[in-house]
Amino acid sequence: MLLNELHVGAFPSQGSLSDYLAAVGVTQVVDATHPFALTISAELRSVCSLQNLPLIRFERPDHAVDEGSLLARVEDLAGCALSGHRLLLAVGARQLAAAAAAARLAGARVHARVLPTAEAIRHAGLAGLSGEQLAVLRPGSGERSGGLEAALCRRWEITDVVCRQSGGAADQLWSELSRKHCICLWKLKRPEPLLSVDAVHSVNQLCRKLDGDVNGSATDPHHGG
């Protein structure tokens, strides 16, 4: 892919997204955005419908999780048995304030890991997290994947971690660390997929679906792969 074919950053509005797709002559759209990026997914569905563009949703895998540890909302932490626990929040920056407040209501001592961006650090401050309570790093950074996260858990004597059921590298990292170090893992349940959008769950399924669309044949995206 050439650099001039790559768009980096958010689209300021649905209209700008629509204009961009029309300007570059897009004929097929694959939505491979984060499962919690609800706004862009909804805008893609709307724009593709208006422009009569085929839309495929690439769904990330589900890592095994105990249903009892799934949270519908971060506010549900307030009702969890966390009194005296040391909790590490590894959720989106915009959810930090609500998650930290709920965890404190449950009696937990709260720490957080955030991305090294000005917005994330600002949200951490609004959540009352700074100094020794806060780690600023990218998931999986360092010489050994998960090494920094494991060191944080040891330093803070973490008993519980909250992450998002994203299906990505961070989700897998926390799933593995929690099993290895006997940490209780809570996951914020991923949003339900948008209706009326075909979904695939592997690269093989995606390739077959794209080939089928190009050749004018209908391929079931929910089989194989």
Show the residue positions of the predicted features.
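A short helix->loop->beta-strand "cap" motif at the edges of active sites that frequently abuts
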Residues: 49-56, 108, 180-184
